[in-house]
Amino acid sequence: MAQQRRGGRRRRKVDYIAANHIEYIDYKDTDLLRRFISERGKILPRRVTGTSAKNQRKLTVAIKRARIMGLLPFVAED
């Protein structure tokens, strides 16, 4: 039997921050930061979110600041 090929071209993920013209990622903007955190509280990687390297670094700093200030959890509660 011949194998069937599946799939096709995957759609390229769009950088949410660049697409919405967000220049400064504020650590107090928890609604924005929660988009880039998993349900367990971990920072999502670039390959999942589609952010650029520059914006991923800015996001990481903002998320870590928000965690230290107590605005975001370090780990999710069960």
Swiss-Prot record:
<dbReference type="InterPro" id="IPR036870">
    <property type="entry name" value="Ribosomal_bS18_sf"/>
</dbReference>
<dbReference type="InterPro" id="IPR001648">
    <property type="entry name" value="Ribosomal_bS18"/>
</dbReference>
<comment type="subunit">
    <text>Part of the 30S ribosomal subunit. Forms a tight heterodimer with protein bS6.</text>
</comment>
<protein>
    <recommendedName>
        <fullName>Small ribosomal subunit protein bS18</fullName>
    </recommendedName>
</protein>
<keyword id="KW-0694">RNA-binding</keyword>
<dbReference type="GO" id="GO:0003735">
    <property type="term" value="F:structural constituent of ribosome"/>
</dbReference>
<dbReference type="GO" id="GO:0070181">
    <property type="term" value="F:small ribosomal subunit rRNA binding"/>
</dbReference>
<dbReference type="GO" id="GO:0006412">
    <property type="term" value="P:translation"/>
</dbReference>
<comment type="similarity">
    <text>Belongs to the bacterial ribosomal protein bS18 family.</text>
</comment>
<keyword id="KW-0687">Ribonucleoprotein</keyword>
<dbReference type="Pfam" id="PF01084">
    <property type="entry name" value="Ribosomal_S18"/>
</dbReference>
<keyword id="KW-0689">Ribosomal protein</keyword>
<keyword id="KW-0699">rRNA-binding</keyword>
<dbReference type="InterPro" id="IPR018275">
    <property type="entry name" value="Ribosomal_bS18_CS"/>
</dbReference>
<dbReference type="GO" id="GO:0022627">
    <property type="term" value="C:cytosolic small ribosomal subunit"/>
</dbReference>
<comment type="function">
    <text>Binds as a heterodimer with protein bS6 to the central domain of the 16S rRNA, where it helps stabilize the platform of the 30S subunit.</text>
</comment>
